[in-house]
């Protein structure tokens, strides 16, 4: 199977290329924090030679509670994204939730993301595809890896073949997620070689059945990320925070920003090793 390459400026995203770190914070909490987090990622990835894309949401439209923080909104969020691009020269990925957001967001950022809960909403998928932007599709927790091929087909039918697929875990009973490592190769096959990345942070979520926010398993972020890269994928999707216990969204799953360099260094070593191996023919 031929691995497709999706280009984001001078970055090649492909399953057989060096892994790309899609890293940042869950939601924009302030302009100053976004600058702090982005600068930390840029310093680490430049030092280690890892291709990098900044990620954050301007609106967490799917929060469990009406009282939870959602973000600064599209207008203010896009201003922050533009300042990050101007200051650090980074590429940026963010999610959209409404049709009217697609083009204005695509005019500023480099990748627009289709949220997992909305991945089968055809009108939204079509509106995103028609912007011509690179699209990152989050696999819904309730969908099998093979079903991602149908979403890819919708996007391609609109004339856009710049598609990245992202696994963020699968429902395992109530209020728990697991990651099926075999699913990465299934998604590659279902999409005819599209780049597949792994959202390790959100895969660590676990819900309090009576609570208004997700808990998380931050202590297992390294082992889960190692496992994903060992399969041979195009990138990791990661959230870090200066003080995860004070984060306004998904802090229990976020990596402390102070641990970022050690984490990325390990991931690069694993990715380099795995992709140095020749592919084995196991067919009969």
Swiss-Prot record:
Biochemical pathway: Carbohydrate biosynthesis; 3-deoxy-D-manno-octulosonate biosynthesis; 3-deoxy-D-manno-octulosonate from D-ribulose 5-phosphate: step 2/3; Bacterial outer membrane biogenesis; lipopolysaccharide biosynthesis
Main location: cytoplasm
Membrane-crossing segments per the record: none
Keywords from the UniProt entry: Cytoplasm, Lipopolysaccharide biosynthesis, Transferase
Enzyme class label: transferase
Alphabetical list of InterPro entries matching this protein: Aldolase_TIM, DAHP1/KDSA, KDO8P_synthase
Keyword Disulfide bond belongs to the record: no
Gene Ontology biological process: keto-3-deoxy-D-manno-octulosonic acid biosynthetic process
Catalysis performed (reactions): D-arabinose 5-phosphate + phosphoenolpyruvate + H2O = 3-deoxy-alpha-D-manno-2-octulosonate-8-phosphate + phosphate
Lineage top rank: taxon: Bacteria
A single Gene Ontology CC term: cytosol
Pfam families: DAHP_synth_1
E.C. designation(s): 2.5.1.55
Molecular functions (GO terms): 3-deoxy-8-phosphooctulonate synthase activity
Localization per record: Cytoplasm
Alphabetical list of PANTHER family matching this protein: PHOSPHO-2-DEHYDRO-3-DEOXYHEPTONATE ALDOLASE
Homology family: Belongs to the KdsA family.
This protein's name: 2-dehydro-3-deoxyphosphooctonate aldolase
Species the sequence originates in: Haemophilus influenzae (strain ATCC 51907 / DSM 11121 / KW20 / Rd)
